[in-house]
Amino acid sequence: MANNDEITTSSHASPAVNHESISRAKQRIKDGLATRRSWRVMFDLHSTGLPHGVSDVFSRIKTNLAYFRSNYAIVILNVIFFSLIWHPTSLIVFTGLVFLWIFLYFLRDVPLKVFRFQIDDRAVLIGLSVITIVLLLLTNATFNIVAALMAGAVLVLIHAVIRKTDDLFLDEEAATTETSGLTSHPSS
């Protein structure tokens, strides 16, 4: 009987750890998606217009890429996903790679260790990028993948150039100051 109690106790400890890991993973996903900006803000027609010069183009690209980076990543991933619908093998590989990215890069709380060596986040990013590119290119959907990446990049750059940056705040302090009414606006 004592052995059964010990086995039961040890088997109950495992689900608690799994539940804790799942809760932590859910929180990290929520935190990651929290950086996504509202699609209404992203596609606000009143905030679009042509830039006034080359410096304005580069300024808008820099600001919009920083502000909408999660949205842009979602757009590019969707373009790639839809381009792979006609290549089921590539789509399966792509889905597996998404899970690999989620667990090895995005949901990792502690530094990755291999054979007692700590792996830097930059090395993980580079390694996962190389693995992703190599595996997807080996699935004979090279043209579709490259075309989808190019189409996604063009869409992102077009949006980044025509989206005005006057109403975007990259830091919390500026957004708080603006929304609290502490800034003065000239009356018209």
Curated annotation (Swiss-Prot):
Residues 1-13 have a biased composition (Polar residues). One of its GO terms (biological process) is vesicle-mediated transport. It is found in: Endosome membrane. Residues 1-25 are annotated as: Disordered. The chain crosses the membrane at residues 67-86, 90-107, 119-139, 142-162. Its main location: membrane. May be involved in both secretory and endocytic intracellular trafficking in the endosomal/prevacuolar compartments. Belongs to the PRA1 family. This is PRA1 family protein F4. It comes from Arabidopsis thaliana. The lineage of its organism: Eukaryota, Viridiplantae, Streptophyta, Embryophyta, Tracheophyta. The gene is PRA1F4.
